[in-house]
């Protein structure tokens, strides 16, 4: 039995949707990537801000950002010498359960809560991204 071109096209389209959803879920299957999404859901940030808040090195943060970007979960924007990352709202609006997980399930988790507390302390510290990179000022901010 043969499929019509239209039937084949519909199956192919549905398969692509499933593959894209799986790619999204795979990108969110690592603690640090969920931490990044959690932080970016509060504010657009650059790599140096993420690495200092999360306590990770630049290569780890960049690797995780790359995977999130490949899955189209985040967007990047270059501003002068800095690259800033922010949430891509489209997949979160398309798959509401992703936003529900972030909003409801993770808000009381100690790691994510700690990241948000660190972000808030950083934002109120008046330390700029340039100062984070050029000095150890971030180390002077009590984070715990």
Q: Language-model features: where?
A:
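N-terminal helix-turn-helix DNA-binding core of bacterial DNA-binding proteins
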Residues: 19-60, 83-92
